[in-house]
């Protein structure tokens, strides 16, 4: 959640940064109006409280001097003040609650070094790694390869569920499992502790990482239950520490988990309708880190390097992109995307996003750490290492042969 104290103190500059992420100016003006009302009420309230305290002391003095009549008169004034104070306190609480609700749907402030831009077309390429493969034949898309090899059964996926669900068979199923184990082992080598988490979480957990209340339409909710299927392991991993004070954070907490992920993909109608690039259910191995504020930049670089190294081990060509302000996610202050080469599309496609949310999620989820005698907000980071289904797509397309078979990357052979 955005720091409301910072927004109130430096409204013009902060709102200017927020507009770069597409925040509606009317919403910001409503918040500004509430800040003004809050300030006016607090000023009046402070005066009334001061007046009440002065009168209360006078009552004590009159009672000591035996002047009960005068004391009773002032008591009436104090009681009248109490009623005014009670009304104002209720108004103040209403305004503060309203500010809190509005803050829950305001995104994080982008870092100063994030490039300014409206959408993905203005993201900035950092570097490319690996050679794009050349074929002496027309490379086939993964869905065509998958059906020919009887690896991917789209028809039965629809029969069992609906569109954007797929049945994986034979070597596709084995490769999916191999990739999960490979990614978990790889992340552990980079110092991330493996965790197994619930695939369903409650509303407070979804709110803690920023999925609720703004993105409810993209979540699968369990009917008659306050439970949601997770869209990413970032949600349960980060919220492990919700409402907690971490006593020792001298070293960052580094976690990794495999989970299936569930997304309605609202707003994706007509995009990636073929194959398994965009599914309602997909596997992902996630990285999450919790750090002191001064350690989060270093951890961000480490997480980008970890995910990048996984692609390099698999021999997959990729590029790194710094996302511009208009393409940043809701909770992110800064994001680097990794995009892997997809031959049939003749372009790079996202396979990982690594984000530093600074103290945005920590403020929502109340995750703090001990710094001497003070409790301070942590920084939280997350990133895919990696999206399993999209890695399978990249392997199928980059490692395909002229006869329609798929070669296996050396790094995966021991897992098969």
Curated annotation (Swiss-Prot):
UniProt-annotated binding residues for ATP: 263-265, 350-353
Keyword Nucleotide-binding among UniProt keywords: yes
Catalytic activity: tRNA(Ser) + L-serine + ATP = L-seryl-tRNA(Ser) + AMP + diphosphate + H(+); tRNA(Sec) + L-serine + ATP = L-seryl-tRNA(Sec) + AMP + diphosphate + H(+)
Binding site for L-serine: 232-234, 286, 384
UniProt pathway annotation: Aminoacyl-tRNA biosynthesis; selenocysteinyl-tRNA(Sec) biosynthesis; L-seryl-tRNA(Sec) from L-serine and tRNA(Sec): step 1/1
HAMAP family named among the record's database cross-references: Ser_tRNA_synth_type1
Family: Belongs to the class-II aminoacyl-tRNA synthetase family. Type-1 seryl-tRNA synthetase subfamily.
Domain description: Consists of two distinct domains, a catalytic core and a N-terminal extension that is involved in tRNA binding.
Protein's recorded name: Serine--tRNA ligase
Organism expressing this protein natively: Nautilia profundicola (strain ATCC BAA-1463 / DSM 18972 / AmH)
Lineage, broadest ranks: Bacteria, Pseudomonadati, Campylobacterota, Epsilonproteobacteria, Nautiliales
